[in-house]
Every structure is written in structure tokens, then in C-alpha cells.
Amino acid sequence: MTFRRRLLQFLALLFVVATLAQLWYLGQVLRLQHHNPDSSAYMHRAQKQGNVQQDWRDYDQISDYLKRAVLISEDAHFTQHTGFDWEGIRYALKRNMEAGKPVAGGSTITQQLAKNLYLSGERTYTRKAQEAVIALMLEIGLSKRRILELYLNVAQWGHQIYGAEAAAQHYFQISAAQLSPLQAAQLAAMLPRPNLYDFKGPTDYVQQRASWIQAQMALVRIPDPGTVPLPPPPEPTAPPEGNTQ
């Protein structure tokens, strides 16, 4: 058998394996239309270190303040993009170049959800490419409301703490539906690195960021908002500097 033929066979096998993998991911995404995930890749790994705190809550059982705060913190253009925020990516690249090191990420809520549900946190081109493919599947297969609901239920909010309900209970001893604007902003300020940015910790960055998030809440659109009134939107300001990778 010639080298060329072996190479073609290898490439054909690689294509088949890659296609089957994408079909598996697609099946998992389509299942999310009507079924809540039992766990996530991040929770599965965390369970090896002990019990994971997580209680599922439907979209309407989570405070609109938290939805607004999370979008302000992580993805202000969530309702407008199709999985990728090119403006956010350009802004992150600019900040990283100015700092000479990674200090900002450009991942959307959808991309973060893809990573949290199915992938690892390793920074490789292969993982980022797979994340992009799954993000497209999520955007095509699910509504914005459903994507945000899923994210709020699987996002990490501290050691072994996953989802809005577990976070609200752990930090404030209340349900996710009862979170105030300040409490919601404090939780959102911890994302996406809650083990580094704990608002009860010694750093001033999280408290400053929480204040900024709370001030910006009225500026963001959320899917299917409730009837809770918000104050008039303030003038947009720049967020405090910090590592948001």
C-alpha cells in the first residue's frame, strides 16, 4: 500500500470520526429543547472532588435582575448576535494587546454554555473550534430564552456551586427569584472566574465591578422580561479593569 493511499484512508477515517462527533453533539443540543441536562462537563469533573451544589430553576423562577446583571457582565449583545459577538472579540483583543497579556475574553454566553456543558477549560485551537461549532448548534436549535436559562443553571459560582439557585442559597440564603439588584450584580461580578473573584473576598475589584454592573442593568435587553420596574438607564461607562478570562 502506497503512502498516498494510506494518507487518504487516514484522512477519510478522520473525517468520519469528526462527523460522528458533531452528530453526537447535535443530538445532545436538540435534546435540550425539551429536557434539562442532568449535569455538565464542569460539574462532572467537580463531582470527583465532592458533592456538587445545584438545583434547577426554570427561567421564570430566576430574578430578572440576575439575568440583566449576567448579560451586562458577560454578553451585553446576547439578544442581538448569533453566537459570536465580533465587537466584543475586537474589544478583548485590543485590551489584551494593550496589556501585553490576556486580561479579557470575547466569549459570548452561548460559547460559555457550549464549553460548560460539553468541553474542558483548556485553551487550545481545537477546543475553541469545537466550542464555536456547538455554539452555532445552540443558536440554531434553541431560543435565546432557553440558552440563557441553561447558562444560569450550569454556570459555576464558586467551589462546587453551580447554577443561580445554589449560588443564591449559598451566598444570601434566599432563592434565585428573590435576588435584589445588588445581590444579582455581586453574583454576576464573579463570572466567569468565581474561584478567583469572590465578592466576599479581599479584592476591591469585584465590589467595584458589582457597582458598575448594577448601574448598567437598565441598558441591556433580556429575553421575555418580567414586570419588575428598573430605574432609567445611566450614561454608559467603562467597566473596571480586571482579568475576565
UniProtKB/Swiss-Prot annotation:
Keywords assigned by UniProt, alphabetized: Cell inner membrane, Cell membrane, Cell shape, Cell wall biogenesis/degradation, Glycosyltransferase, Membrane, Peptidoglycan synthesis, Transferase, Transmembrane, Transmembrane helix
Pathway the protein acts in: Cell wall biogenesis; peptidoglycan biosynthesis
Record-annotated membrane-spanning stretches: 10-30
Compartment list: Cell inner membrane
Cross-referenced Pfam families: Transgly (PF00912)
Any one GO CC term of the record: plasma membrane
Catalysed reactions listed for this entry: [GlcNAc-(1->4)-Mur2Ac(oyl-L-Ala-gamma-D-Glu-L-Lys-D-Ala-D-Ala)](n)-di-trans,octa-cis-undecaprenyl diphosphate + beta-D-GlcNAc-(1->4)-Mur2Ac(oyl-L-Ala-gamma-D-Glu-L-Lys-D-Ala-D-Ala)-di-trans,octa-cis-undecaprenyl diphosphate = [GlcNAc-(1->4)-Mur2Ac(oyl-L-Ala-gamma-D-Glu-L-Lys-D-Ala-D-Ala)](n+1)-di-trans,octa-cis-undecaprenyl diphosphate + di-trans,octa-cis-undecaprenyl diphosphate + H(+)
EC annotation from Swiss-Prot or TrEMBL: 2.4.99.28
Residue spans of biased composition, Pro residues class: 226-239
Topology relative to the membrane: Single-pass membrane protein
Function: Peptidoglycan polymerase that catalyzes glycan chain elongation from lipid-linked precursors.
PANTHER family, per the entry: BIOSYNTHETIC PEPTIDOGLYCAN TRANSGLYCOSYLASE, MONOFUNCTIONAL BIOSYNTHETIC PEPTIDOGLYCAN TRANSGLYCOSYLASE
Protein name per Swiss-Prot or TrEMBL: Biosynthetic peptidoglycan transglycosylase
Species name: Alcanivorax borkumensis (strain ATCC 700651 / DSM 11573 / NCIMB 13689 / SK2)
